[in-house]
């Protein structure tokens, strides 16, 4: 898995550093934070407008983040991540949407060992933003 996000624009680097700090402040037993999707691949869209069937629509990529915990109820972690969202958007210059997925490390490693495509693609294309060093991915 990659660890560098030097290909990202400065605003994204700053946003991600802020988001990681907020997650670590609020989510106990956070073991890993992984950026995946278009920002990890470098195919993100900052803003695009299209006319679809006569309706003007806009689109922008979001930050897709997998938050990996140990010994935590994933529903409770989901609620804690909602507070990260709230805090992040209180700053008016933070405009890129965040999409969180959270999983327990045991479930994630089980999914990886079973070859589940979604998780293996994250492992191949993702960027490790934070790693506690307590666990390894299968």
Stretches with model-predicted labels:
Residues 123-138:
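Catalytic cores of NTP-dependent nucleotidyl/adenyl transfer enzymes across multiple folds
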Residues 2-27, 53-113:
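Metal-dependent nucleotidyltransferase catalytic core
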Residues 43, 112, 116, 133-134:
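Solvent-exposed, flexible loop/coil residues
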Residues 36, 101-105, 132:
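Conserved beta-strand termini and adjacent loop/short-helix elements that scaffold enzyme active sites
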Residues 31-45, 49-52:
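Short gly/ser-rich loop at a beta-strand->alpha-helix junction or flexible surface loop bordering the NTP-binding
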Residues 117-123:
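A conserved SF2-helicase RecA2
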